[in-house]
């Protein structure tokens, strides 16, 4: 599985930037990862061309870690892009192209925090896939 995370704007908050960098470093031990930052939401889709598209959206489906793991296993061998919008959310065109609209929480999350939570969950899923004991249900 090849993962790409495309986010609007680089994290400016120190905790988010450091956390995203740390989880990206950890994830690359388990799967190829591209971490791409764009300036505007309209730039997300071109960066996800040829990938399954998982769009983070507060109106999306809430999945457990295990459900996300199973979904990604079903896409094994494919390229999967996770699209994280900026403060304004996603343009409608991005939501319409989604293979999966995913909500990380019923709460509204600041976009840098949402990116960090996504990175931790992707790391968790990759360790599950590898049989690593990081995830303890």
Curated annotation (Swiss-Prot):
Keywords carried by this UniProt record: Cytoplasm, Methyltransferase, rRNA processing, S-adenosyl-L-methionine, Transferase
Complex formation: Homodimer.
EC number: 2.1.1.177
Compartments where found: Cytoplasm
Designated name of the protein: Ribosomal RNA large subunit methyltransferase H
Binding site for S-adenosyl-L-methionine: 56, 85, 104-109
Cellular compartments per GO CC: cytoplasm
HAMAP family: 23SrRNA_methyltr_H (MF_00658)
Pfam families: SPOUT_MTase
Catalytic reactions on record: pseudouridine(1915) in 23S rRNA + S-adenosyl-L-methionine = N(3)-methylpseudouridine(1915) in 23S rRNA + S-adenosyl-L-homocysteine + H(+)
Top-level taxonomic group: Bacteria
Molecular function per GO: rRNA (pseudouridine-N3-)-methyltransferase activity
Enzyme class: transferase
Main function: Specifically methylates the pseudouridine at position 1915 (m3Psi1915) in 23S rRNA.
InterPro entries named in the record: Alpha/beta_knot_MTases, RlmH-like, tRNA_m1G_MTases_N
Family listed: Belongs to the RNA methyltransferase RlmH family.
């Amino acid at each position: 599985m090849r993962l790409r995370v495309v986010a609007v704007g680089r994290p400016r908050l120190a905790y988010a930037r450091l956390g995203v960098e740390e989880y990206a470093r950890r994830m690359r031990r388990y799967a190829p990862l591209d971490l791409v930052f764009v300036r505007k939401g309209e730039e997300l889709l071109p960066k996800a061309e040829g990938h399954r598209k998982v769009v983070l959206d507060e109106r999306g489906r809430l999945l457990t870690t295990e459900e996300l793991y199973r979904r990604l296993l079903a896409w094994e061998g494919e390229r999967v892009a996770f699209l994280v919008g900026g403060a304004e959310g996603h343009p409608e065109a991005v939501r319409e192209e989604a293979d999966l609209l995913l909500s990380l929480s019923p709460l509204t999350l600041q976009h840098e925090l949402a990116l960090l939570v996504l990175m931790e969950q992707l790391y968790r899923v990759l360790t599950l896939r590898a049989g690593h004991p990081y995830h303890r249900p």
